[in-house]
């Protein structure tokens, strides 16, 4: 049966051909998937950095903006980090994404590499589940002007430096003072990011359908300082009151150095990331498998 998606972009891990057997193996995987897509009636293109770094030739190559303008589907082969990076870039175009897991956990790249064809074939015919993930838009404000801005699908994290003491942070929500917090840092996580750093810091899991964020302190000085769930229509502002060499990271993929008095202002982005999953996909199945729930239970 002809594919529902005519133009499909392949995006892979950014390994270089100099990385030896691992790079060669990854290149073969991508080429095999491209051949499979072609057999399903898809016109395959490669994302520019993927093709360049993996040494792939013989297919059209497009940058991210061109993929957003011309492609019906993005197929991401890698781990969650690969998906986070391309998801932020393609969100404004509304291109749906399917993830094939070539990484470790794979919360958002949920199709196993082994046997991908049996999962992909019905999805290409239109048999899939779709869910949308919110993005955060973060700005670093210094003396009233924006000096850095970024999108985040997982989290925005304000951290102390590795060799310095705690930071003191002033937290406001929609202009209302919440508290001054002394801690190693503070995490603002989306439902997607609630299974990442936020979870390891004691934050709750948020179902992707919940229009919320979670604010999680990292090793707070006061034990009563607990995580709090907020509506994602709020504006969260974090001001650096004291502490040396603090920084803000966005999905752990970009970083901004912070000075005393800087404010990190976080709002919801107008764009969502569209994920496609195999028919019958369940968020709870993913949690159970990835977090090893029920293991050893008869």
Swiss-Prot record:
Domain of life, source organism: Bacteria
Record: active site: 80 (proton acceptor)
Cited SUPFAM superfamilies: NAD kinase/diacylglycerol kinase-like
UniProt record similarity statement: Belongs to the NAD kinase family.
Species of provenance: Albidiferax ferrireducens (strain ATCC BAA-621 / DSM 15236 / T118) (Rhodoferax ferrireducens)
Documented EC number(s): 2.7.1.23
GO terms of molecular function: ATP binding; metal ion binding; NAD binding; NAD+ kinase activity
GO cellular component: cytoplasm
Cofactor: a divalent metal cation
Reactions mediated catalytically: NAD(+) + ATP = ADP + NADP(+) + H(+)
Keywords from the named record: ATP-binding, Cytoplasm, Kinase, NAD, NADP, Nucleotide-binding, Transferase
InterPro entries cross-referenced by the UniProt entry: ATP-NAD_kinase_N (IPR017438), ATP-NAD_kinase_PpnK-typ_C (IPR017437), NAD/diacylglycerol_kinase_sf (IPR016064), NADK (IPR002504)
Coiled coil start-end: none
GO biological process, one term: NADP biosynthetic process
Top EC class for this record: transferase
Protein name listed in UniProt: NAD kinase
């Amino acid at each position: 049966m002809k594919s529902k998606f005519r133009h499909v972009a392949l995006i892979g891990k950014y390994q270089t051909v100099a990385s030896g057997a691992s790079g060669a193996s990854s290149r073969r995987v991508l080429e095999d998937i491209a051949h499979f897509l072609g057999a399903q009636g898809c016109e395959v293109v490669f994302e520019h950095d993927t093709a360049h770094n993996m040494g792939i030739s013989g297919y059209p190559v497009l940058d991210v903006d061109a993929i957003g303008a011309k492609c019906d589907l993005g197929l991401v082969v890698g781990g969650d980090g690969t998906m986070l990076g391309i998801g932020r870039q393609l969100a404004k175009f509304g291109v749906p994404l399917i993830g094939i897991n070539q990484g470790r956990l794979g919360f958002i790249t949920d199709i196993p590499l082994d046997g991908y064809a049996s999962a992909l074939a019905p999805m290409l015919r239109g048999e899939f589940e779709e869910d949308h993930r919110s993005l955060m838009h973060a700005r670093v404000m210094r003396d009233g002007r924006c000096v850095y801005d970024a999108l985040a699908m997982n989290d925005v994290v304000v951290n102390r430096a590795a060799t310095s003491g705690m930071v003191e942070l002033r937290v406001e929500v929609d202009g209302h003072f919440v508290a001054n917090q002394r801690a190693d840092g503070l995490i603002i996580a989306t439902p997607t990011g609630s299974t990442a750093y936020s979870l390891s810091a004691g934050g709750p899991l948020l179902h992707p359908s919940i229009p919320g964020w979670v604010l999680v302190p990292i090793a707070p000085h006061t034990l009563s300082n607990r995580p709090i769930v907020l509506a994602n229509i709020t504006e969260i502002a974090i001001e650096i009151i004291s502490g040396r060499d603090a920084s803000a990271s966005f999905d752990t993929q970009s970083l901004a150095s912070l000075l005393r008095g800087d404010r990190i202002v976080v709002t919801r982005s107008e764009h969502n990331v569209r994920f496609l999953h195999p028919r019958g996909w369940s968020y709870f199945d993913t949690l159970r498998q990835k977090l090893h729930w029920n293991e050893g239970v008869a």
